[in-house]
């Protein structure tokens, strides 16, 4: 039995849509009908649903053999895992966003401090980065900050709050990661999963 850790939320929705596209209907159906279950089994695969930022930890600790997680999570911290595959879903990007008239950024809010700090340092910008856990758009709307750094998929949330994208920072996509020991001990099961997903190994 192969245990796979899946990130809940936006990425899980994108994963289910992708499973339907590649005709893995059984797995997609189980995930769609999960209700509040956090542990599901189908086709000799046990899936555990966890917070995105926890997926690498579950894999690193050997609780899960495989994980599917956003590349943004992996960029913020070092994990003792195999970053095996880029996956063709969960595509979005980090962006700097603000009100249309804003051109100077002294104070910026984000849930992704590492990415934001890295970006501003690279740009040579002296910016105070404020950490928020959610609804970062509001901080800009009420003028607590000049801008935000956030994940953008369609841009509809920015538009709904009167904000525009000022700078495209970096791309994000789903990654398949494995526990280092499981990669050898359960190589055939992992290869089978990769074939089911219709992707090939590129050692990303």
Swiss-Prot record:
Gene3D superfamilies with a match to the protein in the record: Periplasmic binding protein-like II
SUPFAM superfamilies, per database record: Periplasmic binding protein-like II
GO molecular function: ATP binding; ATP phosphoribosyltransferase activity
Domain of life: Bacteria
Keyword Glycosyltransferase: yes
Pfam families, sorted: HisG
Cross-referenced InterPro entries: ATP_PRibTrfase_cat, ATP_PRibTrfase_HisG, ATP_PRibTrfase_HisG_short
Pathway linked to the protein: Amino-acid biosynthesis; L-histidine biosynthesis; L-histidine from 5-phospho-alpha-D-ribose 1-diphosphate: step 1/9
EC annotation from Swiss-Prot or TrEMBL: 2.4.2.17
Biological process terms in GO annotation: L-histidine biosynthetic process
GO cellular component terms, semicolon-separated: cytoplasm
Leading EC class: transferase
Catalytic reaction(s) noted: 1-(5-phospho-beta-D-ribosyl)-ATP + diphosphate = 5-phospho-alpha-D-ribose 1-diphosphate + ATP
Keyword set, alphabetical order: Amino-acid biosynthesis, ATP-binding, Cytoplasm, Glycosyltransferase, Histidine biosynthesis, Nucleotide-binding, Transferase
Protein location: Cytoplasm
Coarse class of the protein's main subcellular location: cytoplasm
Comment field on protein domains: Lacks the C-terminal regulatory region which is replaced by HisZ.
Record note on quaternary structure: Heteromultimer composed of HisG and HisZ subunits.
Annotated function: Catalyzes the condensation of ATP and 5-phosphoribose 1-diphosphate to form N'-(5'-phosphoribosyl)-ATP (PR-ATP). Has a crucial role in the pathway because the rate of histidine biosynthesis seems to be controlled primarily by regulation of HisG enzymatic activity.
Similarity comment text for this entry: Belongs to the ATP phosphoribosyltransferase family. Short subfamily.
UniProt name for this protein: ATP phosphoribosyltransferase
Organism: Staphylococcus epidermidis (strain ATCC 35984 / DSM 28319 / BCRC 17069 / CCUG 31568 / BM 3577 / RP62A)
């Amino acid at each position: 039995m192969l245990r796979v850790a899946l990130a809940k939320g936006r990425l899980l929705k994108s994963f289910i849509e992708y499973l339907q596209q590649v005709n893995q209907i059984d797995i997609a159906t189980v995930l769609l009908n999960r209700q509040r279950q956090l542990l599901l089994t189908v086709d000799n695969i046990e899936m555990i649903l966890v917070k995105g930022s926890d997926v690498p930890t579950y894999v690193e600790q050997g609780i899960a053999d495989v994980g599917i997680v956003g590349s943004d999570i992996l960029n913020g911290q070092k994990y003792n895992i195999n970053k095996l595959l880029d996956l063709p879903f969960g595509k979005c990007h980090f962006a700097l966003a603000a009100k249309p008239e804003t051109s100077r950024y002294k104070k910026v809010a984000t849930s992704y401090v590492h990415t934001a700090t890295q970006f501003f340092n690279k740009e040579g910008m002296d910016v105070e980065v404020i950490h928020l856990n959610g609804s970062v758009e509001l901080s800009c709307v009420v003028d607590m900050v000049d801008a935000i750094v956030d994940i953008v998929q369609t841009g509809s949330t920015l538009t709904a709050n009167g904000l525009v994208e000022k700078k495209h920072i970096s791309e994000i996509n789903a990654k398949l990661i494995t526990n280092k020991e499981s990669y050898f001990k359960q190589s055939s099961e992992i290869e089978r999963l990769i074939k089911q997903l219709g992707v090939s190994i590129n050692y990303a």
